[in-house]
């Protein structure tokens, strides 16, 4: 709100704000509107975190994935702020079931440092597949868990330089992100590896179909004879 004017206060912010909502425009602080002019709370929260941090302070916040690729001017301005004016370190894409049974939306973690002077050269992307729990409403423990791997790779980002875009994590140059309207969705940059599939000749497939039809006809005839007795 306009009454809450705290700024440049915190060294670290870890947040999971409400995913979606709106505020009346007259109730929004001008300092937030200066970052991105919007009434959407998922964007305003990120702007608020930027304002609350001291220079050098860091933030890891969860956002709905629409924040990463939304095409509105407000979405683009917020992403541009993170990439151009702050130091955006990483984007961790999470599967849609991680917040079930409460919410089924796809989300991501934005990791950034407040600099007010830029600093982003490359952004680290990670495609999380599993978090140690099933992705249904029960959220039961399972063996698959990417979190230890995320921590390991994040703390050794120098090793990410040689990773291919087909892998689970990789780095993307700032300029490439800027050229794509500051899109921060991993699917924008990830390369899909297609494995060629070889099929048998058409004549061979037709021969198999004919053989199956003959077998079906034979067994159907036998079944009818059994029923007729």
Predicted regions and their residues:
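A conserved structural/catalytic subdomain of Rossmann-like adenosyl-cofactor enzymes
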Residues: 3-229
């Amino acid at each position: 709100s306009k009454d809450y004017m705290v700024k440049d206060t915190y060294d670290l912010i870890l947040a999971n704000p409400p995913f979606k909502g709106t505020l009346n425009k007259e109730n929004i602080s001008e300092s937030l509107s200066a970052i991105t002019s919007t009434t959407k709370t998922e964007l305003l929260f990120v702007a608020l975190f930027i304002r609350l941090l001291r220079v050098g302070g860091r933030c890891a916040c969860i956002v709905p994935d629409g924040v990463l690729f939304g095409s509105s001017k407000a979405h683009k301005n917020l992403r541009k702020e993170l990439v151009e004016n702050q130091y955006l370190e990483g984007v961790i894409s999470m599967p849609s079931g991680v917040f079930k049974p409460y919410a089924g939306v796809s989300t991501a973690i934005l990791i950034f440092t407040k600099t007010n002077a830029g600093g982003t050269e490359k952004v680290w992307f990670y495609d999380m597949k599993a978090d140690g729990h099933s992705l249904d409403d029960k959220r039961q423990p399972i063996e698959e868990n990417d979190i230890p791997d995320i921590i390991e790779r994040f703390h050794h980002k120098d090793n990410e330089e040689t990773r291919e875009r087909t892998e689970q994590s990789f780095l993307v140059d700032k300029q490439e992100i800027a050229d794509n309207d500051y899109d921060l969705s991993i699917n924008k940059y990830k390369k899909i590896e297609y494995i060629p599939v070889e099929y048998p000749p058409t004549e061979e497939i037709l021969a198999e179909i004919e053989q199956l039809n003959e077998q079906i006809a034979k067994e159907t005839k036998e079944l009818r004879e059994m029923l007729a007795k």
